[in-house]
Amino acid sequence: MTAAEMKQVHDAHVAAENRRDAAAAAATCHPEGFIENVALGVRFEGHAQIAAQYAALFHAFPDAEMMQEGEAFGTDVLVAWGVFRGTMRGPFFGVAPTGRRIAIPFVNVVPFRDGLMLGERAYFDLATLCAQAGLALEDLLAGGGSLPR
C-alpha cells in the first residue's frame, strides 16, 4: 500500500475511535486483524474481539480521545504517535473507575494487509497510566492484564 492509502485507512480508524464507534473502528481492520496492548500484555484477534475491546475501552473512558501528533510510513506499516486522553468513568480491566482524567503518550505500530489494518500494537508507559488514573498496578494486572514476557 502507498503511504496515502495507509493514511486514509488509519485516519478513518482514528475518526471511528474518536466517535467512540467500536464497530466502525473494527471494520478498518483485516478479518485476521489484532489489537495488542503491549504494556498490559493482552491481545485481541478478529473483528468480534477487536470491537468488544474497543467497546470496553469506550465504556471505561466515555470521553476517550486519540490525539494523533505524527506518523511515519514504511513498507505496509504505519507508525503513529500522540496522546490518549480520557476520564476513567467505567471499569478498566476489572478495576473500578476512579473518575480521574488521564493524558498518556502512546506509539502505535500498524501493519497493513489487503487494504486494511492488519493490526495495531499500542505502546505506552503503564506506570504513567497507573499514576494518573489512581490505579495500583497489581489491581490492573489482576483484572486481566499481564506483564509482557
Where are these regions (language model features)?
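C-terminal and inter-domain tail/linker signature
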Residues: 1-149
